Design a protein with these regions (language model features):
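Basic/aromatic-rich interaction segments and small domains that mediate binding to polyanionic partners
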Residues: 2-69
């Protein structure tokens, strides 16, 4: 599935470690807005989280962990 810039999405962050922050199993449905696609293979997107998690607001997320909101 391809996502567009400014599209509202839900991201599953459970078990990911991003910039030293580990997201626990409960973080399966975080609201975010797509900023841009960052890589084609494997596909990943930079997203702007609705809520900051331990100071993280913009993070890169693999496409398989993103779904439309």
């Amino acid at each position: 599935m391809t996502f567009a810039a400014h599209q509202c999405v839900r991201v599953n962050l459970a078990g990911l470690m991003i910039q030293g922050v580990t997201f626990h199993a409960a973080v399966t449905d975080a609201l975010a807005t797509v900023v841009r696609k960052t890589t084609e293979e494997p596909p990943a997107y930079l997203v702007d989280l609705l809520f900051s998690f331990k100071g993280l607001k913009e993070i890169e997320v693999p496409e398989e962990r993103i779904r439309p909101a």
